[in-house]
Amino acid sequence: MAEAMDLGKDPNGPTHSSTLFVREDGSAMSFYVRPSSAKRRLSTLILHGGGTVCRVQEPGAVLLAQPGEALAEASGDFISTQYILDCVDRNEKLDLEAYRLGLTEQASDPKPGASTEGSTEPEPQPLTGRIAYTDAEDVAILTYVKENARSPSSVTGNALWKAMEKSSLTQHSWQSLKDRYLKHLRGQEHKYLLGNAPVSPSSQKLKRKAEQDPEAADSGEPQNKRAPDLPEEECVKGEIKENGEADNKLFEEAAPEFGEAVVDESPDFEIHITMCDGDPPTPEEDSETQPDEEEEEPKVSTQEVGTAIKVIRQLMEKFNLDLSTVTQALLKNSGELEATSSFLESGRRPDGYPIWCRQDDLDLQKDDDDTKNALVKKFGAQNVARRIEFRKK
């Protein structure tokens, strides 16, 4: 776990800030993304940068659309999705108006300083020549491989890359995507803060399934799309505790089912789903407390672990997001599943308070009454107390 923490804090990693889409007043920028093949990737980048994603158009939200969408350009209310990619690539918040889609703009390249004359149709991709890869595209490729490659042979075959090309993840051909990954990206996941090599399913269940169905293992379909049928939304709410908090022990037991560990940007603690680890005990403390913990801590049943897995999968399926994004949302909402569901759906917590960010957690550690009072004013006394308990678990 210490190794994962070091990777998450790699100063040389070309990743964007966790407050990239946070305003100066501390509030998160809200985005609405029109349905498209790139919506999932954009949502992941936005949430990682501290922003929120709305399921419907809301007042004050930045409306995003792909260049070339006639309705979006005709309205003049939409910003090009290239805005998100450029902000991530430069790791800075750029001018929104320079990316506004409209009849007078060149939709294919809405960057600052671009010519506004000519057709509104997107510029066709050139048939010859090379298009340079951006850091955002490299992250997108690694993320796609991590989520969709089911075996080491998947990345050397062609099906995965053809599926990636059809998803319009980038403007590159599947041959170029495959070449980029095999020659430049494979084994470099740690530099992009994506953890270890993606193609290593830890679940024996997934391994057996891949052996039984080799074609499915190379199909390029997202893993979360192959999950068993899930109950309706009403059942999801039934799985949530009355106080809205996740059972951390359940999620710790459930984590291996997904084969992923998620490292948060917040200081001093790491999570597996919503499991937080505090400071490691000294050998003396460990030897003294371990027997008591084994006696007092109730064993989690298989049924309870299954319920936790089901709830997380339902959030992933419901909002079409990956495990990392759902986990980050849970962390920013102190492990409250009901609040997390509301946050992913509307970009807001049901109690109206903001989500927690790295700076808030740093302030929470300060022994300063003024700082603590400011946090209580910002989040409410109950949420501050809940956050403190959440970090201790």
Swiss-Prot record:
It comes from Mus musculus (Mouse). One of its GO terms (molecular function) is G-rich strand telomeric DNA binding. The modification N-acetylalanine is found at residue 2. It comes from the Eukaryota. Keywords: Acetylation, Activator, Chromosome, Cytoplasm, Isopeptide bond, Nucleus, Phosphoprotein, Telomere, Transcription, Transcription regulation, Ubl conjugation. Belongs to the RAP1 family. Homodimer. Component of the shelterin complex (telosome) composed of TERF1, TERF2, TINF2, TERF2IP ACD and POT1. Binds to TERF2 (but not TERF1) with its C-terminus. Interacts with SLX4/BTBD12. Interacts with TERF2; the interaction is direct. Does not interact with TERF1. Associates with the I-kappa-B-kinase (IKK) core complex, composed of CHUK, IKBKB and IKBKG. Residues 125-185 form the Myb-like domain. Residues 78-101 form the BRCT domain. Residues 104-132, 193-304 are annotated as: Disordered. This is Telomeric repeat-binding factor 2-interacting protein 1. Acts both as a regulator of telomere function and as a transcription regulator. Involved in the regulation of telomere length and protection as a component of the shelterin complex (telosome). In contrast to other components of the shelterin complex, it is dispensible for telomere capping and does not participate in the protection of telomeres against non-homologous end-joining (NHEJ)-mediated repair. Instead, it is required to negatively regulate telomere recombination and is essential for repressing homology-directed repair (HDR), which can affect telomere length. GO terms for cellular component: chromosome, telomeric region; cytoplasm; male germ cell nucleus; nuclear body; nucleoplasm; nucleus; shelterin complex. Disruption phenotype: Mice are viable and fertile. No major telomere dysfunction such as telomere fusions are observed. An increased telomere fragility and recombination due to defects in HDR are however present. Mice with conditional deletion in stratified epithelia display shorter telomeres and developed skin hyperpigmentation in adulthood. Its main location: nucleus. It is found in: Nucleus; Cytoplasm; Chromosome; Chromosome, Telomere. A motif (Nuclear localization signal) lies at residues 377-393. GO terms for biological process: intracellular signal transduction; negative regulation of DNA recombination at telomere; negative regulation of telomere maintenance; positive regulation of canonical NF-kappaB signal transduction; positive regulation of NF-kappaB transcription factor activity; positive regulation of non-canonical NF-kappaB signal transduction; positive regulation of telomere maintenance; protein localization to chromosome, telomeric region. Residues 282-297 have a biased composition (Acidic residues). The modification Phosphoserine is found at residues 36, 43, 151, 153, 200, 203. Shares a bidirectional promoter with KARS1. This shared promoter with an essential gene complicated the task when generating knockout mice; the problem was overcome by generating conditional knockout strategies. There is a cross-link at residues 111, 191, 205, 209, 237, 366 (Glycyl lysine isopeptide (Lys-Gly) (interchain with G-Cter in SUMO2)).
